[in-house]
């Protein structure tokens, strides 16, 4: 069936007076718990009711991936210095990948050393004013589904990441891929979608165990205000049973997990954190994305968190059309939208830069939040190494570069970071109306309306020098130097506008 037809169900559910600004004494920038709202006023908000924008990156250094070659590690060693470098790019959010396979390697026994590592990363990020989104990550179910030499595959499948071995039931199905399409073909292996079928059927209680593992981690992390929330499951696959049946199971899994995490938060006297939920990416091993029906929960503190790889992996829609489609789906849920993953990986960096600039325009115009894929990717990552472990690059560039030993080389992807590190409002008083920015000259324009006086916060890149301001109904109360730039605290009232420029 053409993919266009398969997307149809998704689509269906679908004057300014210029004044000079004065500068006063700087203020502290304390990180605080955020919440989400649904309905007419949807998105991320702080305790003062200001709309918050999150910009950041995915980070996999605590990941538990399949190893193709023992001499070529699949992840870079964890280093808190990464968070400092992220902060210098203006990032205020990191999507921190973790894996169930390391959290619960033995059934019913949670890896306290791993939980400590996760908590340390949360604390390290907090020192740089970075929010952490905890993401239970998986790709193609887990690292225990990998083709063996005796499988005699025409197209052998790398192992990936996700579930522990004890929760991997494949019915003896083939691990071989349908074709040589690389990453995009990993889910075509019958062993992968049989494993997901067992998960959604709760065979041997493995889905319950996964939910319990989430609750256990939430008890340990709910005390941190910089934990922005929990991403329930990365890119879930559906099984092989009838589509609507499987979609219903996805929704029930989300609902049960949200309830369990809420109980865990209450049990330790912690406030609620935002729940992030995604759309499925396959059914019967084929690229048939679908969404859970909107009635899976009445929880208000949730956000739709899809991934978009239009003009990167799929070309069915333009990246702008894809963004609009996903925004329409978030409207169906009456939630805010957070793009958990997106990226451009063309052989010509100039092509990727052009696409990223277009995405930036679309995102800014929608006051969007996102995390780019990804901070670092070693040559030994399953995305880059061959199945037999013999073919891999000497170096690998994501946003930073690593060598084949997994070490940071000191090189950065300056072309992409120049766009990703563009200035943006971190907290907006009142109702946002218009926002644009130019990563080439640092110019920023923001317009909003408020029925009470308040403060809007802007992060401004230092690349262009000290910023200048033209405001209507606004006054700069503080301009604080922070990592990578400036934090501008602007007192605003009524319908206001802020223009940032450089001389």
Question: Language model features by range: what are they?
Answer:
Residues 9-16:
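Bacterial N-terminal signal peptides
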Residues 53-75, 299-310, 316-319, 330, ...:
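Glycan-binding loop/region signatures in secreted carbohydrate-active enzymes
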Residues 1-8:
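Bacterial N-terminal signal peptides that target proteins for export
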Residues 111-118, 319-322, 352-357:
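Charged helix-capping and loop-helix junction motifs
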């Amino acid at each position: 069936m053409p993919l266009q037809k398969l997307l149809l169900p998704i689509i269906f559910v679908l004057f300014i007076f210029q004044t000079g600004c004065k500068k006063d004494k700087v203020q502290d920038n304390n990180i605080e718990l955020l919440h989400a709202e649904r309905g007419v006023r949807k998105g991320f908000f702080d305790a003062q009711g200001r709309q918050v924008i999150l910009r950041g990156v995915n980070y996999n250094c605590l990941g538990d991936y399949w190893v193709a070659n023992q001499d070529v590690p699949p992840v870079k060693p964890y280093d808190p210095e990464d968070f400092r470098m992220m902060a210098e790019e203006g990032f205020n959010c990191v999507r921190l990948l973790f894996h169930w396979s390391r959290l619960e390697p033995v059934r019913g026994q949670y890896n306290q050393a791993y939980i400590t590592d996760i908590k340390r990363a949360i604390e390290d990020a907090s020192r740089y004013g970075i929010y952490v989104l905890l993401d239970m990550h998986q790709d193609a179910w887990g690292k225990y589904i990998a083709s063996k030499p005796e499988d005699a595959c025409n197209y052998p499948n790398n192992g990936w990441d996700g579930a522990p071995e004890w929760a991997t039931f494949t019915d003896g199905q083939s691990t071989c891929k349908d074709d040589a399409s690389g990453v995009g073909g990993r889910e075509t292996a019958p062993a992968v979608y049989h494993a997901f079928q067992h998960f959604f059927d709760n065979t041997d209680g493995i889905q319950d165990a996964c939910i319990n593992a989430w609750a256990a981690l939430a008890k340990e992390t709910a005390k941190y205000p910089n934990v922005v929330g929990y991403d329930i499951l990365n890119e879930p696959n559906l099984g092989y049973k009838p589509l609507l049946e499987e979609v219903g199971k996805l929704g029930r899994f989300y609902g049960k997990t949200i309830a369990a995490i809420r109980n865990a938060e209450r049990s330790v006297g912690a406030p609620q954190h935002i729940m992030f939920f995604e759309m499925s990416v396959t059914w019967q091993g084929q690229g048939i994305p679908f969404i859970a029906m909107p009635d899976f929960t009445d929880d208000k503190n949730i956000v739709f968190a899809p991934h978009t790889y239009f003009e990167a992996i799929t070309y069915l829609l333009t990246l702008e059309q894809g963004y609009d489609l996903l925004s329409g789906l978030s409207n169906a849920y009456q939630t805010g939208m957070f793009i958990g993953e997106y990226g451009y990986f063309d052989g010509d960096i100039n092509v990727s830069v052009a696409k990223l600039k277009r995405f930036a325009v679309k995102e800014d115009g929608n006051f969007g939040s996102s995390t780019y894929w990804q901070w670092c990717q070693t040559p030994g990552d399953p995305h880059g190494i061959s199945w037999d472990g013999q073919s891999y690059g000497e170096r690998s560039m994501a946003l930073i570069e690593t060598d084949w030993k997994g070490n940071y080389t000191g090189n950065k992807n300056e072309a992409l970071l120049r766009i990703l590190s563009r200035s943006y409002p971190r907290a907006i008083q009142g109702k946002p109306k218009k926002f644009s920015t130019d990563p080439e000259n640092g110019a920023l324009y923001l317009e909003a309306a408020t029925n009470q006086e308040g403060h809007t916060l802007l992060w401004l890149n230092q690349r262009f020098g000290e910023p200048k301001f033209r405001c209507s109904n606004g006054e700069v109360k503080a301009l604080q130097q922070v990592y990578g730039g400036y934090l501008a605290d602007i007192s605003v009232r009524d319908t206001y506008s802020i223009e940032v420029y450089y001389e």
